[in-house]
C-alpha cells in the first residue's frame, strides 16, 4: 500500500486527469440515467407469475397487461359535454405519442358525468419503454409533481396510471427525495466534518470525494441500465451509500494522515503511513461490504439485484476514490488539509490522540467486563425484541402519499371499473406436447377450470377463455372484488394454485399469474431465501475478519455482535413504522414493512458495520503487535479510534436519516434501519461489547490454529512504518492542547516566526529541553528537571502563548542587532532554533528556550530598557533561577565583546542584572498603583539570576 501511495503521489496530476475524464461524461450520464430505469423489477425467475407474463407477451398479443392507461375523473359539477370533451382530448393526446394505441375495453361504459372514464393503452413494443412513454403522457396531460392535470374549465381531472406511470412517478419522486435529503444532511455532515477537522479545507475533501463517487456511480448505473433491468430505487441507494461510505473512508484516511503529522512525519511520509494503515483498512472494509451485499444476488429478483448492484458500485467507487484520489489530493493540498482554523475553537484537540475520556471509559469497562457485556447484550436484545412482530408485504402504490396523483388515478379507475379490474388474476391452462387447446377434450378441461375459478374467494367474474396464437394454451381472467394489493387477493391466488391443478388433471398444467401473483411470488422468494442470504453474509464477514485480524475468536465475535446490531435495526423498523411511535415526526404508520427491506438491511448493515469492526480491531492488533498486552492494546485502540468511529457514525447517521425523512417509504425504512444499526454498532457494540469481551477472553482473542495461519493470505498490518526522526521536533501533548490558545495567539505566532526567519536566515536546529517549561502539566519526555531541585510552581501557559513570547523577544533582539552599528557585544554563530508542531498542523521554527534567554540578555546589554528587564523576568518566571543561570553562564560561547578576556560578556550581564538601571529611566511614580511592587519583583528576579550565575562561576 505504501508503494501504491508513493506512486500516486508522484503521478498525482495523471490521477487527477484520469478522474476528470471519468467525471465529465459521468455528469451527463447521471443526468439522463433515469430514462432507462423501471418502476417494476419484482419478477421472480422460474415462478408461475413470470411464466404467465411471458406467455401473454409472446402468444396473447391482445391480452397482455396494459402498462399504461389514461383516466378522466369528473368533479361533481361536470356535465356530459365536459366528460365527452375530456375523453376526446385524452384520446387525441394518446394518438400524438409514437408507438401507442388505444385498446377498446368492453367493461368501460360510455362517458358519464358521475363516473370516471378509463382509456386503456397498449405499446407497439415490450413494456421496457413504458416509463418514457408515461413521462410524455404525464407532460401532455399537464401533471405537475403530485398534482393531476385538468381540463380547461377545471371540471375534469386527468391521470396517467399503470406500471409505466408508477415508474415515471417514482423516478420524479426519487429525484425530489434525493435533493431534499441532501439539503437536510449535507449541512449536518459539513458541521460534523468542521468539528472533527477544525478546517474548511479538510472538511471539503471528504465532501468532494463523496460527490465524485455518486456522480461516477450514477454514470455507471446508466450504462448498466442499457443492458439490464435497473429499478428506480437504485438512485436513492447510490446516493445514500455513495455519500456515506465515501465520506467515511476519506475521513479514516485523513484523520490518520493528521495523526502521522502530529507524530512528526513530514507530509509525504504521513501520506504513505496513512495509506499503509487506514488506507489498507478502507480497502478491506470496502471488499467486505461488497462481498456482503452480493448475498442479495441469491434472491435473484431484478429490483433487489439492481439495488444491490448500485450499492456495490457505490462502495467500489468510494474505495477507489479514497485510495487513489486521497493520496493525490493530500500530496497537493496536504498542508491546507492539515491546518486547523484558529476560528474553530471547538475542534482544537488533535484528532488521533488518545482521549482521556475514552481511556477512562475503556478502563472502567474492562474492570467489569461481565457486567458491561451483560448490560450491553440485554439492551440490544430489548431493542431487537419488537422484530418478532414484523409483518412483511409489498406495494408499489404505497410508496406514494395518499394525496399523490398516482393514488388518485388508481382510485378513480377503481371507481370506473371496479377495484379488481385493474389487476385480474390470469390463469394459463397449457396442454403439453402437441396439445390442441381448441379440441373438445381441451375445451371441456378449460370450462371445468373456469367453473372452479368462480368458486374462489373474492372472485366476481371469470371472462371467457382466449386461445393462444400457437393453439397450445388458453387464458382465463378472473376479476376480484378487492384491490390487487389486498391480502384477500393473495388468498385467492393461494386457493387457485391449490385447487385448479386437480381439476385440470394430467392432461394440462395450470399456472396462476397476474399483478397479485407477481408480488406474492416476489415476497415468497424473499422469505424463502433470506436464511440463505444470512448464512452467506455471515460467512463472508467471518472470512474477511479472519483475513484482516487473523483471529478466529475475534472474527466470530465480530459476526455475532453485528447480528445483534442488525436485529436491533429490525426492531426499530417495527417500532417506528408498524407501531407508529414516531408518527408525529412524519413517519407514517403502516400495516406491513416492505419485503425488500430485511435482506437489504441485513446485507448492507452487515457490510457497513464491518467498517468499524475492521478499523477498530486492526488498530488494536497494530498496538498488540507492539506491546503484546491485550488490555493495553484495547485501551489504546478504543481511545485513539473512538473519536474517529463516532464522527464517521454521525456522518452516516446524518445521511441515512436525511433519506429517511425525505424518501419514499421503502427508502425511509432502509434509512431508518441503517441509521439505527450504525448508531448501535458504533456505540454499544464497539465501545462497550468489544472492550468487555476482549478483556474476558484476554490472550484467547489472538488464537489462530497454525494450519489456518499457513493458508490465510497475508494482510501486512505488521509491517513497521518508517521511523520518525523527532530529535528537534516539539509537539503539543494532548493534556496541554485541550487548554487551547486564542486565534490571535496562533496568527501572531505564525507572522512573528516568518519575521524571525527573515531576520535570521542562518539558523541551526537543535533539541529543546525547555520546550514546555512553564506550561501546565509538562510532559516528562520533553521537559527536564535538575536532580535534587524541587519542581518550580509556575503559572500554567499554553505552549503557543509561551512560544509567541519567545518569538517576540527573538525578533526584537535580531531587529536591534540589525539596527545597531556598534553594539557592545556581537553574535558568534547562528541562532539555535527548534521545530514545533502547532494544533493547526503548521510546523514553525522558533528559538529554543536557552536561545531566548540569551537574546533577552543581549537586549539588556545593548538596549537596556524597562521592557527588556520585564521580558527577561517573565522568561525566568517560566523556569527557575538556577536553570536560567546555567544557560546564561555560557554567554561568551555565543557572543563576543569589546574585551576578549574570558567570561567578559557573562560578567557584564551579571552587573546589569544585579542592579537594573534602565536607560529609559523607569519611574514608578509615573506608573499605576502597583508599579512599584511589580518593578521590585522584576529587580528581585534579575538579582536572583545574577546571584545564581556567580554561584555557577565558582
Curated annotation (Swiss-Prot):
Membrane-protein topology: Multi-pass membrane protein
Primary location class: membrane
UniProt source species: Mycolicibacterium smegmatis (strain ATCC 700084 / mc(2)155)
Superkingdom of origin: Bacteria
Transmembrane stretches, start-end: 11-31, 188-208, 214-234, 235-255, 279-299, 312-334, 373-393, 529-549, 559-579, 597-617, 648-668, 670-690
GO CC field: plasma membrane
Example GO BP: lipid transport
Subcellular location: Cell inner membrane
Physiological role: Contributes to cell wall biosynthesis and biofilm formation. Transports the mycolic acid-containing lipids monomeromycolyl diacylglycerol (MMDAG) and mycolate ester wax (WE) to the bacterial surface.
Protein name: Mycolic acid-containing lipids exporter MmpL11
Keywords linked to the UniProt accession: Cell inner membrane, Cell membrane, Cell wall biogenesis/degradation, Lipid transport, Membrane, Transmembrane, Transmembrane helix, Transport
This protein's record includes keyword Ubl conjugation: no
Cited SUPFAM superfamilies: Multidrug efflux transporter AcrB transmembrane domain
Reported consequences of knocking out the gene: Mutant has altered cell wall lipid composition, reduced membrane permeability and altered biofilm formation. It accumulates the mycolic acid-containing precursor mycolyl phospholipid (MycPL) and fails to export MMDAG and mycolate ester wax to the bacterial surface. Does not affect trehalose monomycolate (TMM) transport.
One Pfam family in the UniProt entry: MMPL
